[in-house]
Amino acid sequence: VDGGRYAILGPSGCGKSTMLNIMSGIVKPSEGRLLFDGVDVTEETTSDRNIAQVFQFPVIYGTMTVYDNLAFPLVCRGYDKAFIQSKVNEVAEALSLEGLLSQSARKLTADQKQLISLGRGLVRDNVAAILMDEPLTVIDPDLKFRLRRKLKEINQKYQSTLIYVTHDQNEAMTFAENIIVMDEGEIVQVGSPAELFDRPKTTFVGYFIGAPAMNLFECNVVDAHTIKFGSAKISTETDLKSVKDGNLKLGIRSEYVQLTK
């Protein structure tokens, strides 16, 4: 855990949520091992992993106040009242919930309820990472950008590792420092938003990242740094010595096309 912001991105049904649930311990992998900082935690219980999880739909205690919701993890661990009050007030201020602490949690808006779910992870000093499974699904579109910005502010303030699952490339590209792209249960590429956009390693990533998608064309290798596309020859910095002719495609982003007279 390094305090970074990560996104797991892919189409519906590709295994994103399953991977997240394996990380948290809700699901046990059928094979393989799970390592955190090189330590095998495959057999560790959910509570022993020191992971907080924010689900697609807000999980709150509707009969409690906002304050009691945020305090609940600390109360369960036996912290004294003075520490709990200090920590809850600190987190509530960071999440802009300080004016709502005495209100019933069930009366809040969907975005406020989701912030409570996030806050319950932040009040704990021992949380190694906060896992978020499509946390903005129930949030109005005009609030999504504001909440993503709030999440980035929280990451910078607390240096908490945030892992964000989404099928929305815009959410992933504007939130994460590094993105794990999945397709059909496999990780197909890991990289920064710029790396995924400019240098996709598979046709799937080329099509999936970007709006519009990358234009892909069949091409042939001429030599180590030249390809042939139709009647044109194009030089590239990429070393093509190990590339087989039949596996090569030329990718062009429309954003980089310039027309000259």
What would you call each of these model-derived segments?
Residues T226, G230-K261:
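Glycine/charge-rich catalytic "coupling/switch" loops of P-loop NTPases
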Residues V27-K28, L35, V75, Q156:
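A position-specific signal in ABC ATPase nucleotide-binding domains
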Residues N50, I60, M64-T202:
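ABC ATPase nucleotide-binding domains
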Residues S17-L20, I116-L118:
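ABC ATPase nucleotide-binding domain helices that frame the ATP-binding cleft
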Residues L9-P11:
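The feature captures the beta-strand-to-loop junction immediately N-terminal to the Walker
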Residues G32-D40:
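Conserved ABC transporter NBD signature motif
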Residues Y6-A7, Q53:
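Short beta-strand immediately N-terminal to the Walker A/P-loop
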Residues S24:
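Helix-to-loop junction immediately C-terminal to a conserved catalytic motif
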